[in-house]
């Protein structure tokens, strides 16, 4: 597992245990199917950090979200789409889906905030 910042490596085990399990599955899938290693760029945040990043959701503060880098050369749009489809379509994870502001039930999506990433 790769982390952009040491802070996030230290905070990783403080995330919700189900999120850790789901990420481990996604990371395994990315390695075994696409031969890429994912990089976690953000884990737990404070309210001040969220305000600075213009976040509208409390999911990072509540240990329910991570950001995964997608801008490296080996993560082309097909791979990004496949990773999101894989994690969102697993029947055993359906009960953990959340309802997005747009009314979609999902676990992961591609987002361009301060940089392109899977959230």
Q: Which positions does each model-derived feature cover?
A:
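Extended, low-complexity, intrinsically disordered C-terminal regulatory tails
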Residues: 17-57
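Catalytic cores and adjacent binding grooves of peptidoglycan-active enzymes
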Residues: 13, 56-64, 70-119
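Acidic-enriched, low-complexity/disordered segments with a strong bias for Aspartate over Glutamate
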Residues: 6-8, 25, 37, 42, ...
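General structural signal for secondary-structure boundaries
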Residues: 1-4, 46, 72-74, 113
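Extracytoplasmic cell-surface/polysaccharide-interacting catalytic and binding patches
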Residues: 1-25
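N-terminal start-of-chain detector that recognizes signal peptides
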Residues: 10-12, 34-41, 89-94
